[in-house]
Amino acid sequence: MTSISDSQIIVILLSVFITSILALRLGKELYQ
């Protein structure tokens, strides 16, 4: 297994954070 660097972890966390925000906004628009 290859070791994951800190920069890769930050990028993954940012991408998950952004996608979760977009999903929440889309869900709110569809709910209303």
From Swiss-Prot:
Pfam families tied to this protein: PsaM
GO biological process: photosynthesis
Membrane topology qualifier: Single-pass membrane protein
Superkingdom of source: Eukaryota
Subcellular localization: Plastid, Chloroplast thylakoid membrane
Keywords assigned: Chloroplast, Membrane, Photosynthesis, Photosystem I, Plastid, Thylakoid, Transmembrane, Transmembrane helix
A GO CC annotation given for this chain: photosystem I
TM regions (residue ranges): 4-26
InterPro entries with a match to the protein in the record: PSI_PsaM, PSI_PsaM_sf
S-S bridge residues: none
Keyword Oxidoreductase listed: no
Family per record: Belongs to the PsaM family.
Name of this chain's protein: Photosystem I reaction center subunit XII
The organism's taxonomic lineage, starting at the top: Eukaryota, Viridiplantae, Streptophyta, Embryophyta, Marchantiophyta
Gene name per UniProt: psaM
